[in-house]
């Protein structure tokens, strides 16, 4: 008699690739004891030599699966069908089947590359090499140039893949020396790297090649991190120490900078089981009240007026089957960032981008508005904790300005009179 102790994931979402097999077999398994976040299954098996050989064969196959994880789905199906047809001890068969189901869960738990890219403390470093003139002369949405990308990080050995690069954006594309970029990585290039399952990425870089160029990018990334505290549906970011090797007149000019990656909006849709809404004009009233108020309050907090839900300007729009959901992005024209090139919209009649204007609609549920106000107040400590994580990245004077800027927002939020004067009475429509 041998005792086999097997750990299987409890969460049903951990086994989407094998869910059909899992549902067929779960009822046939022995009773289980729940321990923490896993289910422990103890099975005593009287195994004949033949059964042990089958068990050994499957163990060898499992090792092969781990080594070559790309073929997991196909091989798991083959092993599953083979085991069903085996004439062996029923308990042994259960163990073998459960083993296959367990390892079917590995790509989602142990080998989830798309989550690895946006993991914390990755300390990602990368180098791109290209001719700026070649990149900048091809500015339409379908024209890319190729560049080698050398990268490394915590737990990531140095590797090189080929990426496709193009310029993106509007305002920064016109005025900046380093322009915002979009990266595309072919599936075969990304396989078995931290970039696996991340075919499209945005790359945010400093505007000009000058002293202190990184500070604006740190503040823009801070805005994304603020929003992570305020909405579970958000764009993930990953800081990156970037070196761009500029090819110019037969020379190589190196530029080192802080930058960050932004995940593709399709990843957000997949993660939350929602659909990306087409880029077309929409009625802001079709955006759910909670999402719209959150968007508008967040924009007010960071002093951002450079957005439009109707035209989906700096707005990613999704559909959950009932209402539209809006996610903000591109914050370089906000008062939080206070970029030297940022100019306020003359239609808003403000003298500086640091001057806040609430641009949300009036036709929203008052109870939802009141609830969102309380929610923001409850998140004050989280917001300042996030801000303090960037303290050593900003000049002392600039950090103090940003800190005071966010403090002033919460002062307005916590005062009934100030809230009514600056937000409720300023809503549109």
Roles of regions detected by a PLM:
Residues 1-11, 31-46, 58-70:
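Ser/Thr-rich, low-complexity intrinsically disordered segments
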Residues 6, 19, 23, 55, ...:
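Short hydrophobic targeting helices and cationic amphipathic motifs
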Residues 11-17:
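Short polybasic linear motifs
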Residues 12, 49, 53, 74:
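Cationic, low-complexity basic patches in intrinsically disordered or flexible, solvent-exposed regions
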Residues 77-113:
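Bacterial Sec-dependent N-terminal signal peptides
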Residues 113-429:
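Phosphate/dinucleotide-binding and metal-coordinating scaffold of catalytic cores
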